[in-house]
Amino acid sequence: HSMAHKLGAFHHLPHGVANALMLEEVLRFNSAEAPVKMGTFPQYDHPKTLSRYAEVADSLGLAGTTDEEKLESLIAAVNALKARVGIKPTIRDYGIDEADFLARLDDMTEQAFDDQCTGANPRYPLMSEIKQMYLNAYYGGRHFEEPPMPTAADFEPAADPHDFKRTYRKAGK
């Protein structure tokens, strides 16, 4: 939801369309095998989104024997529904200029990270993960995949030691 807030604000897309454009990436991100949550909530010891998404697929009568297969069936059903109601497959398909999208991407990513809804997500994203989901939703055809765990070489000192959000820099980018 946080990402849709900013996608709509930066690129003048209706909020429902922005949510629909981000949904597949967010479903994949939230259903990670080894999810991490930086906050604690009494209703769960860790996010159980993959099994919850599988329950949704079961309720809809979708195919699959494993939770992963059910997730893929759920995503296929969501994408089919989006197509039936006229939601285009990618952000780019809405006429958002690539240069403009890329020029605003870092600000949009940071604002999505800081959005009040981010803390309520079952899995707390890194800014680099938000950025990758935006890119995937813009270009289409790629999906969120767990990045390798960072090593010491992936970090550099921040100019401002209080600016912890900008300390992590992916090596080679």
Name every feature range the model reports, one short phrase each.
Residues 3, 23-27, 78, 82, ...:
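Short alpha-helical scaffolding segments that buttress acidic/His motifs in well-ordered protein cores
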Residues 100-173:
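Short, amphipathic C-terminal "tail helix"
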Residues 10, 17-100, 143-144, 149-152, ...:
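Gly/Pro-rich interdomain helix-loop hinge
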